[in-house]
């Protein structure tokens, strides 16, 4: 089983390191040719405009969409959540999301870099201990479709983690937390996928 981390831009090394703590075979993905051999793909945080443009330039958007429809697990963190969304309200100039998840996501919902914060969250599917979530220019989920399961919310009710079948999206950066439980959760999703 091989898990790919999209390595076009953003926090991909940190995801690779976190997967390494679990003994998972993790590879950097920069070309569409490497996608079919994967059991799962992580789209990391970074700059959503840049990531979506590079997905198009490198011819990866359509193959990723096709694999998602076949059931391959795909996990978007922060900017990766934006990439997976069907709808992005407001000014989204330059951002072309993959449109895979039935969610409406607002970019930079918590403000600028200086407004970054950490929060301890209860997360459905993880054990009872709270998860240390790191929010950096994070998006939030404004609306979910019928088939979308809400995994976590901030204390004020803001949705920050969702799952829709084989697709997982979270607002924050678990790769920066020092806690590998979210990565373990995704590895379990990937184990169920038959390429």
UniProtKB/Swiss-Prot annotation:
Pathway: Cofactor biosynthesis; pyridoxal 5'-phosphate biosynthesis. Gene3D superfamilies: 3.40.50.880. GO terms for molecular function: glutaminase activity; pyridoxal 5'-phosphate synthase (glutamine hydrolysing) activity. Its EC number is 4.3.3.6, 3.5.1.2. GO terms for biological process: glutamine catabolic process; pyridoxal phosphate biosynthetic process; pyridoxine metabolic process. InterPro entries: Class_I_gatase-like (IPR029062), PdxT/SNO (IPR002161), PdxT/SNO_CS (IPR021196). It comes from the Bacteria. Pfam families: SNO. Keywords: Glutamine amidotransferase, Hydrolase, Lyase, Pyridoxal phosphate. L-glutamine binds at residues 46-48, 107, 136-137. GO terms for cellular component: cytosol; glutaminase complex. The active site is at 78 (nucleophile), 173 (charge relay system), 175 (charge relay system). Belongs to the glutaminase PdxT/SNO family. Catalyzes the hydrolysis of glutamine to glutamate and ammonia as part of the biosynthesis of pyridoxal 5'-phosphate. The resulting ammonia molecule is channeled to the active site of PdxS. In the presence of PdxS, forms a dodecamer of heterodimers. Only shows activity in the heterodimer. This is Pyridoxal 5'-phosphate synthase subunit PdxT. It comes from Dehalococcoides mccartyi (strain CBDB1). The lineage of its organism: Bacteria, Bacillati, Chloroflexota, Dehalococcoidia, Dehalococcoidales. The gene is pdxT.
């Amino acid at each position: 089983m091989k898990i790919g981390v999209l390595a076009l831009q953003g926090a991909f090394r940190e995801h690779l390191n976190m997967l390494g703590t679990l003994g998972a075979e993790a590879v950097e993905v920069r070309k569409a040719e490497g996608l079919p051999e994967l059991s799962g793909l992580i789209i990391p945080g970074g700059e959503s405009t840049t990531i979506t443009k590079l997905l198009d330039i490198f011819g990866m958007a359509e193959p990723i969409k096709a694999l998602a429809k076949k059931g391959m697990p795909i996990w978007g963190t922060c900017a990766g959540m934006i990439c997976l969304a069907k709808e992005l309200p407001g000014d989204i100039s330059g951002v072309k999301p993959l449109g895979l998840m039935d969610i409406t996501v607002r970019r930079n919902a918590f403000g600028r870099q200086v407004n970054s914060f950490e929060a301890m969250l209860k997360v459905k599917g993880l054990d009872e201990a709270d998860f240390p979530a790191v929010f950096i220019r994070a998006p939030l989920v404004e609306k979910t479709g019928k088939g979308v399961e809400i995994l976590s919310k901030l204390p004020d009710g803001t949705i920050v983690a969702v799952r829709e079948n084989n697709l997982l999206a979270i607002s924050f950066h678990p790769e920066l937390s020092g806690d590998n439980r979210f990565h373990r959760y995704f590895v379990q999703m990937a184990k169920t996928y038959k390429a």
